[in-house]
Design a protein with these regions (language model features):
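Cys-dependent protein tyrosine phosphatase-like superfamily
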Residues: 1-119, 132-221
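Substrate/cofactor-recognition hotspot
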Residues: 126
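Active-site adenylate/phosphate-handling loop in enzymes that bind or generate adenylated species
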Residues: 129
């Protein structure tokens, strides 16, 4: 990757330094925010290479990266570690402050059917992007109704509903209030003209206190 050389010891050292400080990786040394969504899928925050090695020993075969930043140190190290360990790395970028477009939702559904399990799915904090994807996994792969799947977006996983990241919760709540009473499945709603990500986000209003926490203190992506 441009700017990061993982082929030499010195290059990896420099990449680790960038990862440690620029990606706030020091906060994740002893905290993985790991939770099994099912016996075949675990959600976590951004894993260190040595943590990926530990996960492989536990049977993980696929690593799903939900972050962007493909030129970042975290990505260089994750790619290096997965190649070294023989893990399949899959990139599926999703955001924490936007209503996912139809193609993202349906793409997630298809992703969960084609990957090899057991799998690990992560974003940076393991709270928001991992949360919405866990909701979609629980609904599409496990067959849970949206009401139950929504448990994956909660403070238990450090997700803060009252901030800008609450737009994720709001998206599912709109389905439950607007479409479910009409008998529409979640997929039918997403594929209908009523599913308008721009309008849904415009209708959403973030709470001031939650916004201060997620934007100012936690500095979520």
């Amino acid at each position: 990757l441009p700017g990061y050389d993982t082929t030499t010891r010195w290059g990896r050292f420099r990449t680790y330094l960038s990862y440690l400080w620029n990606d706030h990786a020091y906060l994740r040394l002893g905290f993985k925010n790991d939770h099994w969504v099912s016996p075949e899928l675990v959600r976590t925050n951004q894993p260190w290479p040595h943590q990926l090695a530990e996960w492989k020993k536990k049977g993980i075969k696929t690593v799903i990266n939900l972050r962007g930043g493909f030129d970042g140190s975290f990505y260089a190290l994750e790619k290096y570690a997965c190649e070294k360990l023989g893990l399949t790395m899959v990139d599926f970028v999703i955001t924490s402050r936007e209503v996912p477009i139809k193609e993202r939702v349906l793409g997630a559904r298809d992703l969960f059917e084609r990957i090899e399990y057991p799998a690990l799915m992560h974003c940076k904090s393991g709270a928001d992007r991992a949360g919405i994807m866990s909701v979609l996994y629980a609904h599409y792969r496990l067959g849970l109704p949206i009401e139950e799947a929504l448990e994956q977006l909660s403070f238990k996983y450090l997700h803060i509903k009252q901030g800008k990241t609450g737009v994720l919760d709001y998206t599912f709540e709109r389905y439950l209030t607007d479409a479910a009473p009409k008998g529409l499945t979640f997929t039918q709603w997403v594929e209908s003209p009523d599913y308008d990500p721009v309008k849904i986000k415009a209708d959403f209003r973030a709470g001031m206190i939650g916004g201060i926490v997620t934007e100012g203190i936690l500095r979520r992506e």
